[in-house]
Regions:
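Loop/turn-to-beta-strand initiation segments
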Residues: 55-58, 99-104
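Short glycine-rich substrate-engagement loop in P-loop NTPases that contacts/grips substrate
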Residues: 23-58
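Extended alpha-helical interface modules used as scaffolds for assembling large macromolecular complexes
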Residues: 51-54, 67, 74-89, 108-368
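P-loop NTPase catalytic core of nucleic-acid-dependent motor ATPases
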Residues: 1-33, 216
Length: 368
């Protein structure tokens, strides 16, 4: 109804924090939770069939760590994009791919980024706006819960599971009935909430952040409409407040509102210096040293702040997998690169009597 692409919310954190228990109340809206809860432990083809079976409903997948990390990134795209593989028919003709629309919930001890990193793969920005990582630590030392209602966290988790297995299935019918009878109200509510959520972002927010804000606005809109439908008995202001809080926590965890590629550039350059700061950078004040092999650049500690001077070859290595030019612009924008006017490289006089153009990175990048 609102034209928003599919997406998933991924609860990640240590074992026994209530991640799986959080799936049960959500699933109980649609039916018996144990019958509707699925595992990530499946092939991409298997999950395609599972997604199709949950078209226009909720899909819940437990334990992301059980899916092959080689397939995890592609599966994330597939689930959110709502389209399976294009296949050939019995006689070689093209078969139409399976299509669906859904929001999915996911749990796991690791994020999608960490899961892909376990085999040396880098998460893509498009995957991170389709699978939105949310910490299972609510900050109250009770896992996913921020209040226990007089119980300890473990008992509350068990209570939610038990109640969800006893009372289930009826709310979805009331919800769908309300939506079909009041479909004209849906988009105006969403547009108003969307406008408020986008207005809450800093002006410099990247499009990726705005897309995720739009998805949280959709969730908040669903909550407000469910209250109007008397499906939920919650204070209206609590719905928007909760969704805005999660959006802000997501922004905080990702490191800000800049594009993911720009943040990745800063992380990679910082990591490169941390790993190779002494072994591949020659101290400028002591002159040439044959001890440095595969030199990436020089260290200049003669000024008020330390500078790591990258040769273009060293810069390309430090920003491998990214655009070196875009990475330089990202560090310039963050204040970590000393430019020559608008140019990211500047000429530097070196002890070996050369004066090459180099990328001059401030040592303060290691402090943040």
């Amino acid at each position: 109804l609102c034209g928003v692409d599919g997406f998933g919310l991924h609860l990640y954190g240590a074992s026994s924090t209530g991640k799986t228990a959080a799936l049960y109340p959500a699933l109980s809206v649609w039916g018996e939770p144990n019958q509707l809860r699925h595992s990530w432990r499946a092939t991409a083809n298997g999950l395609e069939g599972t997604a199709l079976a949950h078209n226009d409903a909720l899909l819940a997948l437990d334990e992301m760590g059980e899916v092959d990390p080689k397939e995890a990134g592609d599966v994330a795209y597939m689930l959110a994009n709502g389209q399976g593989k294009t296949r050939a028919g019995k006689y070689g003709e093209m078969r139409l791919p399976a299509r669906w629309r859904l929001v999915f919930l996911s749990t796991g001890e690791v994020t999608l980024e960490s899961h892909l990193a376990s085999i040396g793969k880098r998460v893509k920005a498009g995957q991170q706006v389709r699978v939105i990582d949310l910490s299972a630590d609510a900050g109250a030392q009770m896992g996913v819960f921020n209040q226990s209602h007089g119980m300890n966290a473990a008992d509350l988790a068990d209570h939610l599971k038990q109640q969800s297995r006893q009372h289930y299935g009826s709310l979805a019918l009331d919800w769908l009935r309300y939506l079909t009878q009041h479909s004209a109200q849906v988009c105006p509510v969403f547009q108003n909430v969307r406008q408020r959520f986008l207005a809450s972002l800093p002006p410099e927010s990247d499009g990726q952040v705005r897309r995720v804000a739009e998805k949280f606005a959709l969730l908040a809109s669903a909550g407000l409409l469910a209250i109007q439908a008397k499906v939920l008995d919650w204070p209206a202001q609590s719905v928007e407040a909760a969704c805005l809080s999660q959006l802000n926590q997501w922004i905080l965890a990702r490191g800000g509102v800049a594009a993911n590629e720009d943040q990745q550039a800063i992380r990679q350059v910082r990591s490169f210096i941390e790993q190779h700061g002494e072994s591949r950078f020659t101290p400028k004040q002591t002159g040439y040293s044959s001890q440095v092999r595969q030199r990436a650049g020089w260290i200049d500690s003669t000024g008020p702040q330390t500078l790591y001077l990258f040769y273009p070859t060293g810069w390309r290595e430090a920003t491998e997998g990214l655009s070196p030019d875009r990475a330089a612009k990202a560090l310039m924008a963050a204040g970590y690169l000393v430019p020559d006017g608008n140019r990211p490289q500047r000429k530097v006089s070196l002890p070996d009597n050369t004066r090459p153009r180099m990328y001059c990175v401030k040592g303060s990048i290691l402090d943040d």
